Regions:
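Sec-dependent signal peptide cleavage junction
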Residues: 20-33
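Bilobed "Venus flytrap"/periplasmic-binding protein-like clamshell domains
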Residues: 43-46, 66-82, 114, 133-191, ...
Length: 211
């Protein structure tokens, strides 16, 4: 069955209209003593970044791994490294490890779909976003909520999203009378819960849903 028939997406009008994607937490990089730009990302957040077994389409090998990373975030990282005249090193980290990696100096920057919040601005600096994505709810095309047309129609569902995101922390709590499960560790884990029927819908961004 085609994906377009399996999934339906509903814009969540009562919550934030968009989130920033591809923002950086940046540390200064001196050209005098650094010739490699170390960029962290999940490598599991399609279409922004994902893991693949080869270098097709210009993918970059992941540090310490035989796998490669590609996606919009990798394309952006390659462009920045080229402009600086640096080599590029992609570091694969879990979502919750991205900001701490910048703070500790493990990496020079992060390119990720992170909303710019006051809490995060106290920990790292952000560039201007390179992309803004609409926040939506994603339901199964044959599920109980396939005909939902408004936030009101989403009441009473079992739901989740990815941990430490505005999807989970800010958006889902605004939908009344839901059974909010513990957050998923990653975007793929979130989608898996929807596919297996563990939840009725998830909150995510439009590109992730389409991927």
């Amino acid at each position: 069955m085609r994906k377009s028939k399996m999934w339906r997406m509903l814009a969540v009008a009562a919550v934030a209209a968009s989130m920033t994607c591809g923002v950086f937490g940046v540390q200064s990089v001196s050209a005098a003593d650094k010739k490699t730009l170390k960029v962290a990302m999940e490598c599991g957040y399609a279409p922004y970044n994902w893991t693949q077994p080869d270098d097709s389409n210009g993918a970059v090998q992941i540090s310490g791994s035989s796998d490669y990373a590609y996606g919009y975030d990798v394309m952006m990282a390659k462009k920045i490294a080229d402009e600086l005249g640096y080599d590029l090193e992609i570091v694969k980290l879990d979502w919750d490890s991205l900001v701490p990696a910048v703070q500790s100096g493990q990496v020079d920057c992060v390119i990720a779909g992170q909303s710019i919040t006051k809490e995060r601005q106290q920990m790292v600096d952000f560039t201007d976003p390179y992309y803004y994505a609409s926040i939506i709810t994603l339901v199964k095309g044959d599920g109980d909520y396939k005909d939902a047309a408004s936030v009101e129609d989403l009441k009473g569902a079992t739901v989740t999203s990815q941990q430490n995101t505005i999807w989970y922390d800010s958006c889902l709590p605004q939908i009344e009378n839901t059974n909010l499960l513990a957050p998923a560790d990653s975007a793929p884990a979130m989608i898996m819960q929807l596919q297996t029927g563990a939840v009725d819908y998830v909150c995510t961004d439009m590109p992730t849903a389409l991927a």
